[in-house]
Amino acid sequence: MSKPIVLSGVQPSGELSIGNYLGALRQWQQMQDDYDCQYCVVDLHAITVRQDPKALHEATLDALAICLAVGVDPKKSTLFVQSHVPEHAQLGWLLNCYTQMGELSRMTQFKDKSARYANDVNVGLFGYPVLMAADILLYGAHQVPVGSDQKQHLELARDIATRFNNIYSPENPIFTIPEPYIPTVNARVMSLQDATKKMSKSDDNRKNVITLLEDPKSIIKKINKAQTDTETPPRIAHDWDNKAGISNLMGLYSAATGMSFEEIEAKYQGVEMYGPFKKDVGEALVAMLEPIQAEYHRIREDRGYMNEVMRQGADKASARAAETLKKVYEVVGFVGRP
C-alpha cells in the first residue's frame, strides 16, 4: 500500500527560528516513515521580497543543511531546492491562468506583506499563492502541513485544483485535492517579548526570536528577559488567556524536555519567583539545539555531500513533477515537443 504524499517547504530568508523547528522541521523528521515526503527549500518564493543575492545563496545552503541536521533523511524523503525543478515555475505560470484576480486580492498575507514592503509590491508577491499551489499539485500531495498564516493559501490551491479538474478532466481528475495536515501535537511558539504574536524569523526586534543556530549564551539571555507577568505570588500555569508569557515558556520547555504541562506545573508549584523556571527553560533549549547545531556545522562544511543531496533530490522531484506537467500540458492542448 502506497504512503500518503506530503509536501512542505521552508523559506531561505533570514535565520530559521525555533518556531520553524518546533512547528515544521521536527515534524518533517517524524513523518518520514509514515508518509511519502517531498521537502523543498523554496527559494523562488523567497524572491517575492527583495533579497541580497549573496545572502540568498548562503541562506539556501544553510536551510538545506539545517533540514539534514534535524534528521531529514534523503534516502527516506525527497529533499530539494525549488529552483532546481523548473516544473514549479512552469506549472505556476499555467495556474495563473486559472486563478481570479479577486481571489488573490483577498489573501491576507499579501495585504500584510504589501503593507510591510510598500516600496516593492511586485507581481510575484501577489501571485505567491499560485506558485504555492503549483508546488503542492505537482506531486499529488494528499496532505500539506500549514500554519495559520498559510491556511488561506491551501484553500486557494484546493479551489484552483477543483476548477482545473472540472474544466478538463471531471471524470479522471489530474490534480489531487490536498488536505491540511494536522499534527497530533501542535507547537505554539510565540514572540518572547509579546506572547500574543507568533515568533517570526523576520522580526526586526531580535529579542523576540531564538534562531536554531543561536549562541547558547544568547539563548539564556533572551529567555531570562522573556515576557512573564506580575502575578503575586508567581504561578507557573498554562493559561493563554491570562498568562500568555508563562504559557509560551511552558510550551518551549515542554517541547525541549518532553514534559507535559501538568508535570511542569507540579514541578514549579509554589515558586517564589520566575527566575529559576526561566533558567531551566533556557538550559533545556540549549540542550535541545546543541546536537542540531553540531550536525549542521559538520554538514555545512561538506559541500560535496550537500551537492549530491541537491542533485539527487532535484532528479527525484523532477521525475515526478514532469509526469504531472505532461498530463496538464496535454489536456490544455499544448503541442508536445517533438
UniProtKB/Swiss-Prot annotation:
Keywords: Aminoacyl-tRNA synthetase, ATP-binding, Cytoplasm, Ligase, Nucleotide-binding, Protein biosynthesis. The keyword tRNA processing does not apply. GO terms for molecular function: ATP binding; tryptophan-tRNA ligase activity. ATP binds at residues 11-13, 19-20, 147-149, 189, 198-202. A motif ('HIGH' region) lies at residues 12-20. L-tryptophan binds at residue 135. CDD domains: TrpRS_core. It comes from the Bacteria. It catalyses: tRNA(Trp) + L-tryptophan + ATP = L-tryptophyl-tRNA(Trp) + AMP + diphosphate + H(+). A motif ('KMSKS' region) lies at residues 198-202. GO terms for biological process: tryptophanyl-tRNA aminoacylation. InterPro entries: aa-tRNA-synth_Ic, Rossmann-like_a/b/a_fold, Trp-tRNA-ligase, Trp-tRNA-ligase_bac-type, Trp-tRNA_synthetase. One of its GO terms (cellular component) is cytosol. It is found in: Cytoplasm. It is an enzyme of class 6 (ligase). Its EC number is 6.1.1.2. The keyword Protein biosynthesis applies. Belongs to the class-I aminoacyl-tRNA synthetase family. Homodimer. NCBIfam families: trpS (TIGR00233). Catalyzes the attachment of tryptophan to tRNA(Trp). This is Tryptophan--tRNA ligase. The gene is trpS.
